């Protein structure tokens, strides 16, 4: 069944196994990198810098300031700070403050092509 049909005719509900709901290290690394990176971009204020691109499109500095009011800038910069904080919390979760956390095991390919549990 396709994913689109599953929206209108969902499969029966079932209990998820523990392995299906466990966190994984690659997921944690990617969410940390995205949160810190995008949060840094927003917190830096770069999205609100008037530059050559806006001038080339014929947008004046006063028009640019109207399109980006102060409350909008503060909101996005604050959200960027929250993303940075979330990224550091997420990145240190398994080894700093939640030391008993279990992660999914992945099967690795050995040199002879067989899979082995990690």
UniProtKB/Swiss-Prot annotation:
Main location: mitochondrion
Keywords assigned by UniProt, alphabetized: Mitochondrion
Subcellular location: Mitochondrion
Tagged with keyword Mitochondrion: yes
UniProt-listed InterPro entries: Mitochondrial_unc_protein
The keyword Nucleotidyltransferase is assigned to this record: no
Disulphide bonds in the chain: none
GO cellular component: mitochondrion; peroxisome
Note: Present with 752 molecules/cell in log phase SD medium.
Family: To S.pombe tam6.
UniProt name for this protein: Uncharacterized protein YDL157C, mitochondrial
Organism: Saccharomyces cerevisiae (strain ATCC 204508 / S288c)
Organism lineage: Eukaryota, Fungi, Dikarya, Ascomycota, Saccharomycotina
């Amino acid at each position: 069944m396709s994913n689109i049909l599953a929206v209108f005719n969902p499969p029966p509900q079932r209990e998820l196994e523990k392995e299906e709901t466990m966190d994984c290290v690659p997921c944690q690394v990617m969410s940390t990198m995205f949160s810190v990176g995008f949060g840094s971009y927003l917190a830096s204020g770069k999205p609100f810098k008037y530059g050559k691109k806006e001038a080339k499109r014929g947008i004046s500095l006063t028009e640019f300031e109207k399109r980006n009011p102060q409350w909008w800038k503060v909101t996005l910069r604050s959200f960027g700070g929250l993303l940075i904080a979330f990224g550091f919390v997420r990145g240190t979760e398994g080894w700093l403050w939640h030391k008993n956390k279990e992660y999914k095991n992945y099967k690795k390919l050995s040199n002879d092509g067989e899979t082995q549990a990690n």
